[in-house]
Structure formats: C-alpha cells, structure tokens
C-alpha cells in the first residue's frame, strides 16, 4: 500500500481563495504528520518552499488547488516524475479533480491512512520539426493563428499520407482529453484506460473529414502548407510556433491521479451525462 510521506502543495496564484485553501491544506497535512513542501509561487512562508519543477522530484505526491487547468499545468511541468496528483476543485467544472474544499479534512485523513487508489492516464509526446516539446495530457492542437482563415494540412499515420484537408485546424487527443476540446469539436468520449489517440478535425471544409481513433502506438504527423499561418497549442495552455512537422506519439510518461473510490463513469455521468 502506497502511503506518501512528503506532500507538495501548489495552486492558482492569481486566485486569493486558492492561496487561502493551500494554507489550510498545509496545516491539515502537517497535523497528519506529512512533511510539506510548498510551491514558492504561492508565497506561503511557514513551510519549506521549492519551485514547481523541482517539487516533482522531491515529493511523493502533489495536491493542486484550482481546477482542471491547474492539474494540466502541474502534470506538464512535472511530467517526467509521474508524481501522483490530488486535485482540489475551486472551479466550475473540475472533471479531473477529486475533492472539493469542504472535503479537505477527510481527504487528508485518508491520505494518511493510505485509503485511496491510483489511476493512471496515458500521455502523448510532441515533437515539432524533430525537436522534443514535452508531453500533453489532454491534447495537442494545430490551429490557424488567424481567426476565420483556414489552414491546409496533411495528416499521415506511420508515414502513410492519409488525407489533405482545409480546416481551422486538427487536434490529437488522449482518452483523458476526449472529454475536453475534442468533445466540443465532435470527437468521441473514450475511457482513459483505452490506449489510443483521437484525431479530430476542427471545422473541416469537407463532409468526409471525420474524427478517427487510432492506436496510441501509431505515429501521427501533421504538416501545414503555410506554417506561418498556424500555431501549436498543448493542453490549451502552451503556445508554440509551427517550425516543421508536428509528430505525436505515445509518451513514456503517465499521469497518476489519487482517487477515493469514485469511478470514471460516475464522474462522467455527474459532469456530462445528465440525460435522466
């Protein structure tokens, strides 16, 4: 049974409430006997401080205060360390988060007892023009940098040129990201334990361009005719210049989330499927 000893705490620095909740989390963890390290950007002075990148190699788990965006940022920065993440939701949605502010005391108590499960989510590795650009937990998007102006891209799978399409762009998502931008663009919902990539065109200019699900072991490549008219966006947060072919493959890293018994389908029904 995995029982963390050293807990890292981070959160949204632009939200005063998040800083206050982070302070409370630190106190709760301290009382339960955890060693606490705090993201130095939070400015909490009572506990040892460390930058987020270094936190990944110093702690046994990280508690994030915010929402899904906070989790995506932390997961990307600490990707190589695969540190388990417990998300505390202060936002409106929080599909990846596990607890609310009201459930903090019980959550920290369960952490101390080792009363939780670890849930693994696959990531994608991104290269642009042969240069390694890290991992995506949700998706990598190649999109027009000029609103209302389409781009022409070529999609290849394992070196085989599959199609050429005019569109606003195209994204390659993980199963985790299937409930994010890809879903809004008409892509399918895929359970995180399915090892696949979802290729979803964005407003394509032909009826036959449809979302596609391929093995995560495939190499997906995207070439844009006029790279200066497009950009690459990772997890909706990191913007990059398009300096060559975008190559997307399975990452050797995974994201690990702490769960207290909730299942994927329970969260899916609660957040998305309100058909009853």
UniProtKB/Swiss-Prot annotation:
Pfam families (UniProt xref): NAD_kinase, NAD_kinase_C
UniProt-annotated binding residues for NAD(+): 68-69, 73, 138-139, 149, 168, 179-184, 237
Active site residues according to the UniProt entry: 68 (proton acceptor)
GO terms of molecular function: ATP binding; metal ion binding; NAD+ kinase activity
EC number annotated for this UniProt entry: 2.7.1.23
GO CC terms of this entry: cytoplasm
An annotated GO BP: NADP biosynthetic process
InterPro entries tied to this protein: ATP-NAD_kinase_N (IPR017438), ATP-NAD_kinase_PpnK-typ_C (IPR017437), NAD/diacylglycerol_kinase_sf (IPR016064), NADK (IPR002504)
Coiled coil region boundaries: none
Function field: Involved in the regulation of the intracellular balance of NAD and NADP, and is a key enzyme in the biosynthesis of NADP. Catalyzes specifically the phosphorylation on 2'-hydroxyl of the adenosine moiety of NAD to yield NADP.
Family recorded in the similarity comment: Belongs to the NAD kinase family.
Name of this chain's protein: NAD kinase
Organism listed in the record: Methanopyrus kandleri (strain AV19 / DSM 6324 / JCM 9639 / NBRC 100938)
């Amino acid at each position: 049974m995995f029982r963390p000893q050293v807990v890292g705490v981070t959160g949204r620095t632009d939200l005063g409430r998040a800083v206050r909740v982070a302070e409370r989390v630190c106190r709760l963890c301290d009382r339960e006997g955890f060693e606490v390290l705090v993201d130095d950007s939070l400015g909490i002075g009572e506990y040892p401080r460390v930058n987020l990148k270094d936190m990944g190699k110093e702690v046994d788990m990280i508690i994030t205060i915010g929402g899904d965006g906070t989790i995506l940022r932390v997961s990307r920065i600490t990707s190589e360390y695969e540190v388990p993440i417990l998300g505390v939701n202060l936002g409106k949605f929080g599909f990846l988060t596990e607890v609310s502010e009201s459930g903090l005391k019980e959550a920290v108590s369960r952490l101390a007892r080792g009363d939780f499960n670890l849930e693994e989510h696959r990531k994608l590795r991104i290269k642009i023009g042969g240069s390694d650009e890290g991992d995506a937990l949700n998706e990598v998007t190649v999109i027009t940098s000029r609103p209302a102006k389409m781009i022409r891209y070529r999609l290849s799978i394992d070196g085989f040129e599959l199609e050429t399409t005019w569109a606003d762009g195209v994204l390659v998502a993980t199963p985790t990201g299937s409930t994010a931008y890809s879903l809004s663009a008409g892509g399918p919902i895929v359970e995180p334990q399915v090892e696949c990539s979802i290729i979803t065109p964005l407003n394509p200019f032909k009826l036959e361009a449809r979302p596609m699900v391929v093995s995560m072991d495939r190499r997906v490549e995207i070439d844009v005719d006029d790279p200066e008219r497009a950009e690459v966006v990772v997890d909706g947060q990191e913007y990059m210049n398009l300096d060559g072919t975008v190559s997307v493959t399975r990452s050797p890293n995974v994201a690990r989330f702490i769960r207290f018994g909730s299942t994927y389908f329970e969260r899916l029904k609660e957040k998305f499927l309100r058909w009853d």
